[in-house]
Regions:
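N-terminal hydrophobic/helix-forming segments and targeting peptides
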Residues: 1-161
Length: 161
């Protein structure tokens, strides 16, 4: 149990330094303007255009690799990226199991990680433990200790309510 965990629960975050690991899959958080401009991975862009992905707020599109395995995901931020700052909480409920990293986003990296952590919360005290869901690598540009403390505190407050 980490020093910031008040109630023992699985962490929604990948162990460090997962951000640079080859096993960590990218999430491109994009707006419709990013798709139009083609400002991210070419294969993911081609898949988004072929699938008609519009980057609506909270929309998710899984991107296959050439080998047919999962290669990443596109996450919509809505028009001009002006979305709710904690929209990444939806990623915690919609991404498949595995380790993920935010590859591109107009939302601050710490805000994306905090949103993901808060979205991963589940009250499970009287239930069977759920299977491990997706885990997010906290970006190096974000304050990991602060994010861990905040997610633990919010989780405790939710448990007490």
């Amino acid at each position: 149990m980490s020093p910031y965990t008040l109630i023992d629960r699985p962490s929604p975050f990948a162990p460090e330094p997962a951000e640079t690991s080859a096993d960590t899959l990218p999430v491109w958080a994009v707006s419709p303007a990013d798709i139009e401009a083609g400002t991210f991975d070419a294969a993911a862009l081609a898949w988004a255009r072929a699938a008609g992905f519009q980057a609506a707020e909270g929309a998710l599109l899984l991107v296959p690799g050439q080998d047919g395995k999962l290669a990443g995901a596109l996450f919509g931020l809505g028009n001009d990226g002006q979305c709710h700052p904690f929209i990444a909480g939806k990623l915690a409920r919609t991404l498949p199991e595995g380790d993920w990293r935010i590859e591109m986003s107009s939302v601050a990296p710490g805000t994306m990680a905090l949103g993901f952590g808060m979205g991963a919360y589940r009250f499970e005290r009287y239930r069977k433990p759920a299977a491990q869901g997706p885990r997010l690598a906290i970006p190096q540009a974000a304050d990991a200790d602060s994010i861990h403390r905040t997610v633990a505190a919010v989780g405790l407050a939710r448990d007490l309510v």
